Design a protein with these regions (language model features):
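Asp-based, Mg2+/Mn2+-dependent phosphohydrolase catalytic module
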Residues: 1-31, 38, 42-43, 47-113, ...
Length: 169
């Protein structure tokens, strides 16, 4: 299932060093919100996230939020952390990601997407040729029914992915 396989994995977004982006020529960092930057419907970022965002902005990288949530939900969080956003993205469909690339003036090869879900963030990134997909571990267990179901669907895919990368490391 190559479309569900991330290009790279980190435990949390705060574990990704700025040098990672520079080494790969990545200039546009597209970020998921829920369970990547904050918990669901929470206006406060997880510990260390604001500092991570500020450090990447200081490195002259462009960061933006891409979310399937409504503009009202995304706007309140985006304003708090100082980022612009594209809402109603309909991930894994790629038109939201394409809109973000066009809005900020970067090619797919200069773009990465960071998120915690295989079936939205990673699949969406992998469906747009050239985009680097980065999976991060969710910060918290899912509380919502459908998201818990999706996590059970992700589990066997992630087991195979981690077995493969551990075999090669």
């Amino acid at each position: 299932m190559p479309f569900l396989t991330p290009d790279v994995y980190f435990s949390h977004i705060t574990d990704i060093p700025g040098s990672f982006f520079e080494e790969r020529g990545l200039k546009l960092i597209i970020l998921d919100v829920d369970n990547t930057l904050t918990s669901h419907n929470n206006p406060t970022p997880f510990p260390g996230v604001q500092e991570w965002i500020d450090a990447r902005k200081g490195e002259r990288l462009t960061l933006a939020i891409l979310s399937n949530n409504t503009p009202d939900r995304v706007r309140s969080f985006a304003e708090k952390v100082g980022l612009s956003f594209v809402a109603n993205a309909a991930k894994p469909l790629t038109f939201g990601l394409s809109r973000a690339c066009k809005k900020y003036g970067f090619s797919s090869k200069e773009t990465c997407i960071i998120g915690d879900q295989l079936f939205t963030d990673i699949l969406g990134g992998n469906l747009k040729p050239g985009v680097t997909s980065i999976l991060v571990q969710p910060w918290e267990p899912e509380q919502h029914g459908f998201l818990r179901v999706k996590r059970t669907w992700e589990a066997p895919i992630l087991r195979r992915y981690f077995a493969k990368i551990n075999k090669h490391s």
